[in-house]
Amino acid sequence: MKLISWNVNGLRACVTKGFKERFQELDADIFCIQESKLQEGQIDLDLPGYYQYWNYAVKKGYSGTAIFTKQEPLSVRYGINIEEHDQEGRVITLEYPEYFMVTVYTPNSQNELARLPYRMQWEDDFLAYLKGLEKEKPVIFCGDLNVAHKEIDLKNPKTNRKNAGFTDEEREKFSKVLESGFIDTFRYFYPDQEGIYSWWSYRFKAREKNAGWRIDYFCVSESLKDKLEDAKIHTEIFGSDHCPVELDICL
């Protein structure tokens, strides 16, 4: 199976930059997007052969997630059943016979870390949600996690130590996710690979210089380790300030 995750940074804009062509070329079994920035009815996306599931933020033009899947799931859940967290359309969970598929757009801690305290609460609650699912069956989760875990995961670690996405607090929360029994699939296959990123600022010609961050992930329950085949980051694909990431898994 081929699974894709892409923060499209506004789907309507991404559609004008080749989203549908890239979607067809990638031909994923499950395709997850984050930061759709849509309200219901604002786009009619014709994707033959796919079931579509959307979670919208209450606030217009903000956040939002979607999953497009060739196989109809057994059930669909929106959010994580905590009202404080479920206003921004950040999580969708599809249940399949053998696993749960979760996509997430993790809250950004923002300039001057204004939202870091909220982010810390989110991290604890989202991990608890994942572990609750895992009691039923294995979990695959993907999305823009808004954290570069280690220094190898961004071009300029020293100058970003106190910036959103690379604070000690955020990195420690992701370490806890891994310690709890999840695998960062890209690092599982490529533990020492440098210079591979999934997000670049639109400023300072960052993508041209490859001054990026790896903040988009596929993580899986330890019990799925033997089914992993490959993990890829599609740095060749444009259309957003993020590029798609991929997981190949035998399920």
Language-model region placement:
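Conserved beta strand-loop-helix elements of the APE1-like EEP
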Residues: 60-75, 196, 204-226
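Surface-exposed cleft-lining segments at the edges of enzyme active sites
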Residues: 81-82, 107-123, 158-163
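Structured beta-strand-rich core segments of catalytic domains in phosphoester-bond hydrolases
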Residues: 37, 42-109
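Active-site beta-strand/loop signature of hydrolases that rely on acidic residues for catalysis
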Residues: 7, 23-41, 101, 130-151, ...
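Active-site beta-strand termini and strand-to-loop segments that position acidic
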Residues: 70, 94-97, 221-222, 240, ...
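Active-site-proximal beta-strand elements of phosphoester/diester hydrolases
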Residues: 1-9, 98-110, 142
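N-terminal, active-site-proximal structural segment of metallo-dependent hydrolase catalytic domains
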Residues: 1-47, 51, 57-63, 176
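Metal-dependent phosphoesterases centered on the DNase I-like endonuclease/exonuclease/phosphatase
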Residues: 30, 51, 125-211, 215
